[in-house]
């Protein structure tokens, strides 16, 4: 579902994307978007079985992980207790509600605090992005943007050519288009 939504968002920007798991196509792509749908353990097992885990880690072009894609770029996930790609040396944690009104999964619109990541050029802190997730990445050295639900966490990560968002830019209207455009312009 989400990879099709990313494809539609890119088409609205005039970009013709190729949805593929072909290693040669991925290696020769100008940019790679790694959207995630599903559960960490199952998806990591698939990536390992197909050799895509090593390929993704060794990509040199800009890579954007979205939602589960971001989580899988981390070291370890509490979802399934699985070792992940370890691009970002940080573990993915499960949200634990602290109050009755805290609902998991976190579904909704949040503003985010940004840093100087190129992904957020022209972005104001009054803009909202859409989240739907039960697991989060704590703030860390790779945090490119933060938000707060139950407690502060990483809304986006950045290291070298790897960018990642916990939120779904493809569902965020003009704000998401701006983020995707910034990624495409890297």
Model-identified regions with their sequence ranges:
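A short, Lys/Arg-enriched amphipathic alpha-helix followed by its capping loop at the start of a domain
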Residues: 9-16
């Amino acid at each position: 579902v989400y990879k099709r939504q990313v494809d539609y968002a890119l088409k609205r920007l005039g970009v013709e994307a190729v949805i593929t798991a072909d290693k040669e196509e991925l290696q020769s792509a100008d940019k790679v978007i790694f959207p995630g749908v599903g559960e960490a353990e199952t998806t990591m097992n698939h990536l390992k079985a197909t050799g895509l885990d090593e390929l993704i880690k060794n990509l040199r072009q800009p890579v954007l992980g979205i939602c589960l894609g971001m989580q899988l770029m981390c070291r370890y996930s509490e979802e399934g207790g699985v070792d992940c790609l370890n691009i970002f040396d940080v573990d993915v944690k499960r949200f634990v509600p602290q109050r009755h009104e805290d609902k998991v999964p976190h579904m909704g619109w949040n503003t985010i605090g940004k840093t100087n990541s190129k992904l957020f050029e022209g972005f104001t802190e009054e803009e909202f992005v859409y989240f739907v997730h039960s697991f989060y990445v704590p703030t860390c050295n790779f945090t490119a943007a933060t938000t707060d639900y139950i407690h502060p966490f990483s809304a986006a990560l950045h290291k070298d050519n790897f960018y990642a968002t916990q939120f779904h830019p493809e569902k965020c209207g003009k704000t998401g288009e701006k983020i995707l455009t910034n990624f495409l312009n890297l």
